[in-house]
């Protein structure tokens, strides 16, 4: 694990985080938008490059230039949904706000409570396109993309389990359908579904199947399908790492 030294934030800022969290719970519950909010948080963070220290969860995804990246099709909807709440909390950085929203999206759908440390600063320059995972690719691609972020095999499989939420939309990704029978509940059903083979009406992407094709990925899939607590524990660690890529790292 990368050692962290979190910045001191003022009491007023901490209180704003807590109030914002309550407002986000209300919005995400009312609009059933946890899946797209989680996707926004992930795609915001997943552009980090551990070598060049560029990209990452620093709020640049709000810019039209980054929203126009192919991997971010449809995420303008999430930005627009969240904007009225962000306007209530001008003190918060977009960087913190989007990662806080991702934490709430997991928690409010029955998933684990992920620790949240405030203090990310907004950056201006969006990262180059092409740093996010592509659904049509296989094992090597997953390791390349997540390795560039500084994440490992366990993180890859645990984060893949986030596909328990939501669905694919043909006009956004070229694929259609949900991964699990209940796409608004965060649980370990993603792993059960991919192990049980393709089913009518449910989706399996090439990147999902890749988890079964690899001797290092497969044991994690089997473990998480059998033990939801183990999945939640590893997911929490992986989500926290993703949400803090390039943030508060000790030199």
Curated annotation (Swiss-Prot):
InterPro entries: Ccp1-like, Haem_peroxidase, Haem_peroxidase_sf, Peroxidase_I, Peroxidases_AS, Peroxidases_heam-ligand_BS. One of its GO terms (cellular component) is cytosol. Induction: By excess light treatment, by wounding and by heat-shock stress. SUPFAM superfamilies: Heme-dependent peroxidases. It catalyses: L-ascorbate + H2O2 = L-dehydroascorbate + 2 H2O. It is found in: Cytoplasm. Pfam families: peroxidase. It is an enzyme of class 1 (oxidoreductase). Coiled coil: none annotated. Detected in bundle sheath cells, the photosynthetic cells that surround the phloem and xylem. The keyword Transport does not apply. Keywords: Calcium, Cytoplasm, Heme, Hydrogen peroxide, Iron, Metal-binding, Oxidoreductase, Peroxidase, Potassium. GO terms for molecular function: heme binding; L-ascorbate peroxidase activity; metal ion binding. Belongs to the peroxidase family. Ascorbate peroxidase subfamily. This is L-ascorbate peroxidase 2, cytosolic. It comes from Arabidopsis thaliana.
């Amino acid at each position: 694990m990368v050692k962290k030294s979190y910045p001191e934030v003022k009491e007023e800022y901490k209180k704003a985080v807590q109030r914002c969290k309550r407002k986000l719970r209300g919005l995400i519950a009312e609009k059933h938008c946890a899946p797209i909010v989680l996707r926004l948080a992930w795609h915001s963070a997943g552009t980090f490059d551990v070598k060049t220290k560029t990209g990452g969860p620093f709020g640049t995804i709000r810019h039209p230039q980054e929203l126009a990246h192919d991997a971010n099709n449809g995420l303008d909807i999430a930005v627009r949904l969240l904007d009225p709440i962000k306007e209530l909390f001008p003190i918060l950085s977009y960087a913190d706000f989007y990662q806080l929203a991702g934490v709430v999206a997991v928690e409010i759908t029955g998933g684990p409570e992920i620790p949240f440390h405030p203090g990310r600063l907004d950056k201006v320059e969006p990262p180059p396109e092409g740093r996010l995972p592509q659904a049509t690719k296989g094992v090597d691609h997953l390791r390349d993309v997540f390795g560039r972020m500084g994440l490992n095999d366990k993180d890859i499989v645990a984060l893949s389990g986030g596909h328990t939420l939501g669905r694919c939309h043909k006009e956004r990704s070229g694929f259609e359908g949900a991964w699990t029978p209940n796409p608004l509940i965060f649980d370990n059903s993603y792993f059960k579904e991919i192990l049980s083979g393709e089913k009518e009406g449910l989706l399996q992407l090439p990147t999902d199947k890749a988890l079964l094709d690899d001797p290092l990925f497969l044991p994690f899939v089997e473990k998480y399908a059998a033990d939801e607590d183990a999945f939640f524990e590893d997911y929490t660690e992986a989500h926290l790492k993703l949400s803090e890529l390039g943030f508060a790292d000790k030199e």
